[in-house]
């Protein structure tokens, strides 16, 4: 074996170093002692990992072409690492509790392991490596969902997550086997050269799409998503809703545009149906929720529909719009979950929407930051969420102009998505109304968030404002996608 090819895997290599240092630091230190240094150490290691890999690299490959990387993949890995860093920072307050402090090292190692699996997944150029990366991410994620295993809801959420992941993996591997039977190869490039529309390949594509649809929580593959989000620790729910979803969506986009390019008319119709169902049904269910974590679960399903809307364009603009949307979604959604986690810690574990009544009077800063994040998720200008939705719509419209036979369908889907944007604004404003207008006989007391929570909120808020105003962020992603 030529070991020099490992030099082409710098992001994965640096993550392995971070994982090993975290393991030895946890192993060699006493868990009974006050380890205030542990969280800063892991966060600094993640910052070093991001700095080393922030600049897009040239297209390289390893292991006979099974592993490939390039500027666009490098940018996405940086975004995923940024999201993981924010989760680690905000997790400090939660991991300081007596019932979780002794598991702090395990949490960091599990979350780094999931990120390592996602990196392998997005760099895969072979269905086998893709599946291995996916499982590398899914197994530690199941452990994270059931991290509070002695809480009934967390154990139930973990069981449901494992069952869903197992079923989706089985569906996906069956689709891959059909594609192998039809094409005789598992390399993405080779499959793209020989694949053509036939009952076998169409069935394989549908099964593969369905398997990843479960990972992204698209309708109708969203079963138990809300239950898993509600039962998992809030910090894990935030990670699950953005980082893993972003990696799976990018991978599905790349495979559809690269491997299934000759079958574009088939998967485009499939996407249209799934996008409309995901955005519409999730919005309608979100309005009915009183539990804020279930509320954000249906919000994330709707956001997944918007993310996949970019794929309809089937061009470099699609990759740019999707990656930019994931970046904005990471900072906005994690800002919301950071506030939910902080309020939960100071309100006896309550995450009901009624507990936010009058939050502005007792904790005005948190209410203001929550409003900024919700406005960004809803696409209200001048926040970054508005620009991300604009670029997604623009990518979809460009796809309508390219694919004339399905152009009318694309315009119809974009129109439905625009209408649903108004609907999503309504249910996001329900939380704003609760914080600023509604009164409570037993309001949440005034409290000071931990320094780590303040830092996480600062990073997210700067991202919400700056990523929309600073055009070089979009240009950075666009240059990488077109390289």
Language model segments and positions:
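Alpha-helical transmembrane segments of multi-pass membrane proteins predominantly involved
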Residues: 1-483
């Amino acid at each position: 074996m030529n070991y020099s090819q490992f030099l082409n895997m710098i992001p994965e290599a640096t993550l392995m170093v971070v994982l090993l240092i975290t393991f030895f630091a946890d192993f060699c230190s006493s868990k009974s002692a006050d380890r205030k240094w542990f969280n800063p150490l892991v966060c600094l290691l993640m910052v070093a990992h991001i700095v080393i890999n922030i600049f897009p690299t040239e297209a390289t490959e390893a292991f006979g072409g099974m592993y490939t990387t390039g500027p666009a993949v490098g940018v996405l890995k940086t975004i995923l690492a940024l999201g993981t860093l924010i989760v680690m920072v905000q997790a400090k307050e939660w991991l300081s509790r007596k019932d979780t402090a002794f598991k702090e090292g395990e949490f960091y190692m599990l979350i780094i392991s999931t990120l390592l699996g996602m990196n392998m997944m997005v760099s895969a150029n072979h269905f086998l490596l893709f599946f291995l990366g996916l499982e590398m991410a899914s197994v530690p994620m199941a452990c994270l969902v059931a991290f509070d295993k002695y809480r009934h809801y967390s154990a139930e959420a973990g069981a449901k997550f494992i069952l869903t992941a197992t079923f989706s993996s089985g569906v996906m591997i069956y689709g891959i086997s059909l594609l192998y039977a039809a094409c005789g190869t598992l390399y993405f490039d080779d499959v793209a050269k020989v694949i053509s529309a036939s009952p076998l390949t169409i069935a394989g594509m549908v099964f593969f799409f369905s398997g990843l649809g479960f990972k992204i929580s698209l309708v109708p593959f969203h079963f138990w998503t809300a239950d898993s989000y509600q039962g998992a620790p809030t910090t894990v729910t935030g990670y699950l809703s953005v980082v893993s979803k972003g990696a799976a969506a990018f991978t599905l986009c790349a495979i559809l545009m690269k491997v299934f390019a000759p079958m574009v008319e088939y998967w485009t119709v499939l996407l249209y149906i799934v996008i409309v169902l995901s955005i519409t049904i999730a919005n309608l269910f979100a309005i009915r929720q009183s539990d804020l974590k279930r509320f954000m679960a249906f919000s994330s399903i709707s956001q997944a529909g918007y993310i996949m809307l970019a794929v309809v364009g089937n061009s470099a603009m699609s990759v740019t719009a999707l990656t930019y949307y994931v970046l904005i979604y990471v900072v906005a959604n994690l800002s919301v979950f950071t506030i939910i986690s902080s309020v939960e810690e100071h309100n006896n574990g309550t995450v009901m929407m009624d507990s936010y009544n009058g939050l502005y009077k007792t904790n005005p800063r948190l209410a203001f930051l929550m409003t900024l994040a919700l406005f960004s998720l809803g696409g209200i200008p001048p926040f970054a969420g508005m620009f991300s939705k604009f670029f997604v719509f623009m990518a979809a419209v460009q796809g309508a102009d390219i694919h004339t036979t399905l152009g009318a369908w694309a315009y119809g889907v974009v129109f439905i998505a625009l209408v649903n944007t108004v609907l999503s604004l309504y249910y996001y404003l329900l939380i704003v109304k609760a914080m600023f207008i509604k009164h409570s006989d037993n309001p949440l007391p005034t409290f000071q968030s931990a320094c780590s929570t303040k830092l996480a909120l600062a990073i997210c808020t700067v991202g919400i404002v700056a990523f929309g105003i600073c055009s070089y962020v979009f240009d950075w992603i666009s240059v990488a996608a077109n390289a």
